[in-house]
């Protein structure tokens, strides 16, 4: 299996399966001399780990990260653990697998999952929890994102769940402080209360629901990205689309821009106090011509409902026989909830990569 690595200069390779011994990542290209401790990575993993509320899978994984390489400390570093510029290997052990839950689907294809497509491509698949196609893999991305944030300390990255099923938040109630105060990473307290009742009903029905996640990066300097095939928004779209269950991505106003007139969509400018243009709007989501404008970079993506549900679905098995299939196991009723910290991590990795690429071509400008 190839294509387990992304990035150009800040490169992340993830490894592992849902029910394997461990999963993790190797981060290559991180500059030397950056302070990096395991507890900083752990803080990000703790936001994503399962079993923290009744609204996520009840699989209970501590997700304890181990730094295997790429850091060093002694008296000359003042006791601080610093990156050395060599590959940083991070490992997270799996401790709460229940593979027996999946024995009945060994030769069956779960609707909406990658069972059939993995079989069609490789002729073999790890059916236990979805193997490599499981959202469990995203724990490694979150770990890598914690390293990426060290490369871009001046950039603030935050994400939130802004829609669950048909219920979108009221944007006039947006409060970033609320994101950490409810189990949905929701910036609207009223919407979070609604989601609690709504998702309880979904869970009782043995069903699932989709979501929309919005991730915002502030403090991004103008100039990151490149024309045509190195566009910042193209790389961000690819990064977000690579997250499990994501089926659509938009930048800035995205698809809503199609309904606007040109004068409504224009990000007009006036002279700023720092000698740079001051934008009067940000319909473009902080990216123009594939290059960052200095405005907040705004990305949204849609997450489909979790495919594993408790009502019978029509399918077939490897022999071509038609079957009715109920998916057992422990699953998220809304996988979009735990996609929030994953979105931040992917934004961080892409921006770290583009920061290093920009420096390589243009020095420290901007």
Swiss-Prot record:
One Gene Ontology CC term in the entry: cytosol
Keyword NADP set for record: yes
Keywords, sorted A to Z: Amino-acid biosynthesis, Aromatic amino acid biosynthesis, FAD, Flavoprotein, FMN, Lyase, NADP
Co-factor: note: Reduced FMN (FMNH(2)).
Keyword Lyase: yes
Binding residues for NADP(+): 48, 54
Subunit-structure text: Homotetramer.
Protein name: Chorismate synthase
């Amino acid at each position: 299996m190839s294509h387990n690595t992304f990035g150009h200069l800040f490169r992340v390779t993830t490894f592992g399966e849902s029910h394997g011994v461990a999963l993790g990542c190797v981060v290559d290209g991180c500059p030397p001399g950056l302070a990096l401790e395991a507890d900083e990575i752990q803080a990000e993993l703790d936001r994503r780990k399962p079993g923290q509320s009744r609204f996520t899978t009840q699989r209970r994984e501590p997700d304890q990260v181990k730094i295997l390489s790429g850091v060093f400390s002694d008296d000359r570093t003042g006791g601080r653990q610093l990156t050395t510029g060599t590959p940083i290997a991070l490992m997270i052990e799996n401790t709460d697998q229940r593979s027996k839950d999946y024995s009945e689907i060994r030769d069956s294809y779960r609707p909406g999952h990658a069972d059939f497509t993995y079989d069609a491509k490789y002729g073999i698949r790890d059916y236990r929890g979805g193997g490599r196609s499981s959202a469990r893999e995203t724990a490694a991305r979150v770990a890598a994102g914690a390293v990426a944030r060290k490369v871009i300390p001046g950039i603030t990255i935050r994400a939130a769940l802004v829609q669950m099923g048909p219920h979108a938040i009221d944007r006039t109630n947006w409060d970033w402080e609320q994101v950490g105060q409810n189990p949905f990473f929701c910036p609207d307290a009223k919407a979070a209360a609604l989601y609690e009742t709504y998702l309880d009903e979904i869970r009782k029905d043995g069903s699932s629901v989709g979501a929309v996640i919005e991730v915002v990066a502030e403090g991004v300097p103008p100039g990151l990205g490149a024309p045509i095939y190195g566009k910042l928004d193209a790389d961000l779209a690819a990064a977000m689309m690579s997250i499990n269950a994501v089926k659509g991505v938009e930048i800035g106003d995205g698809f809503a821009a199609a309904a606007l007139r040109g004068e409504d969509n224009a990000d007009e400018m006036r002279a700023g106090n720092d000698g740079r243009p001051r934008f009067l709007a940000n319909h473009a989501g902080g990216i123009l011509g594939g290059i960052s404008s200095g405005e907040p970079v705004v990305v949204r993506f849609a997450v489909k409902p979790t495919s594993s549900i408790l009502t019978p679905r029509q399918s077939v098995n490897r022999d071509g026989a038609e079957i009715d299939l109920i998916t057992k196991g422990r699953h998220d009723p809304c996988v979009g909830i735990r996609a929030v910290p994953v979105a931040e991590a992917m934004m961080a990795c892409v921006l770290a990569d583009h920061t290093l690429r920009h420096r390589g071509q243009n020095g420290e400008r901007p």
